[in-house]
A protein has these predicted regions:
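C-terminal SET catalytic tail plus cysteine-rich post-SET Zn-binding segment of SAM-dependent SET-domain
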Residues: 74, 79-165
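Catalytic cores of histone-lysine modification enzymes
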Residues: 1-83
């Protein structure tokens, strides 16, 4: 993996972000999210910004490492690959050296569990302005994300795909 080639530094998206110091090829694992796994009822701080949902009621907490700083983008260059209670960040395409690594936070979140939303600051051409649970993304984007295998099975299930209110 690429852990030794990642640095945390100031970001235009969030206060800090994860950047690569080398070119990263397409479709490869970059790093694993390594925090403690919690059930929804065990979360020490349910509002911590570094929580990552990895199952309907399962979360990975902050690790104190680079994975705590990966920012959101509505046009991401990475995806979060979730298998069981493990989450690994993969490149979606070739990522040039010096680039910030991002993934779409909505691809791992179901609003039924964490009931959160936040203002988006990615400034991409695809910016949705608000980040929230997967079911609130427009249906065309939901289908694209599912087709490209960008969402874990607990989210891709047809009963979770709903139109926005």
């Amino acid at each position: 993996m690429y852990n030794e080639h990642l640095v945390v530094k100031d970001s235009k998206i969030g206060s800090k972000g994860v950047f690569t110091t080398v070119r990263i090829p397409a479709n490869i694992p970059i790093f694993e999210v390594t925090g403690t796994v919690y059930s929804e009822n065990e979360l020490p701080d349910p509002n911590h910004p570094a929580l990552l949902q990895v199952g309907p009621n399962t979360f990975i907490g902050p690790s104190g490492d680079v994975d705590d700083y990966i920012n959101h983008s509505c046009d991401p260059n990475c995806k979060m690959h979730v298998v069981g209670n493990r989450a690994i960040v993969y490149s979606l395409y070739v990522i040039p050296a010096g680039s910030e690594l991002t993934f779409d936070y909505s691809t791992t979140s179901t609003d039924e569990q964490d009931k959160w939303s936040m203002e988006c600051k990615c400034n991409s051409n695809k910016c949705r302005k608000l980040i929230s649970g997967f079911q609130y993304i427009d249906p065309a984007t939901q289908r694209e994300y599912i087709r490209k295998n960008l969402v874990p099975l607990y989210i891709a299930q047809p009963n979770l795909i709903k139109k926005r209110d």
